[in-house]
Amino acid sequence: MGFNEQHAIKHVVIDEAQDYSLVQYQIASNVFKSAKITLLGDLNQSIMPFVNYTSYEPIIKMFLRDRARDKEETQYLTKTYRSTVEINNFARKLMVNQAYYREQVERHGDQVEIIQDHETGEKSKMVQDAVEFKKRFGTVAIIYKTKKECKELQKALAKTKYAKDFLYMIDGECNFSTDKVMVMPLYTAKGLEFDAVLVAGCNEDNYNSETKKLFYVACTRAMNHLSLYYDDIPSSLVL
């Protein structure tokens, strides 16, 4: 396979480094052979099923080999500033790789809420809570695991009094609002942060030991308040 090397580019920054395969990194290494490489990532936030690193060593060794070097500079950002102590303590239990636990800033807030909600549409407690949170917080998001679930909520609220209160980021829209509750699937929420987050569908069949990293990503979008909603059997991860 041939590659057009990009010698004009001197430095490449790769964000979300935990989500790229070694094949993709090999291509990047070949294309940007003369460039310096900076990797930014969190191994606990890997959501790609074909990638499961336990460390960055395989990636680093490949870049060093291709550049005929024997050492790299690694800096670990060991303090997290995003979330409150209460949210961070909850999220820590979800971390697959505890070796990468980060020190947290001592900023306290609400306890994490775990709520059973059998209702749907405008009768849903989650929907009512989200509207109330908008009066208290700047940015509020409802995070579903899938796009299908987001569309179901959109349809359920379309002709209700709450229709104007919600903004949907489902099919790649780049809308972002501080005036409305944002509704999005987990893969869209990745990399974003909100004052208050409501995670929907926290049932055992949605979030379990096999999908712990996905749940970790959803929960760590919250800065000040985190509410978790389930309708039947709660995920063992929330207990």
Task: Identify the residue ranges that each predicted region occupies.
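Conserved helicase motor core of SF1/SF2 NTP-dependent helicases
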Residues: F3-H7, H11, Q18-L239
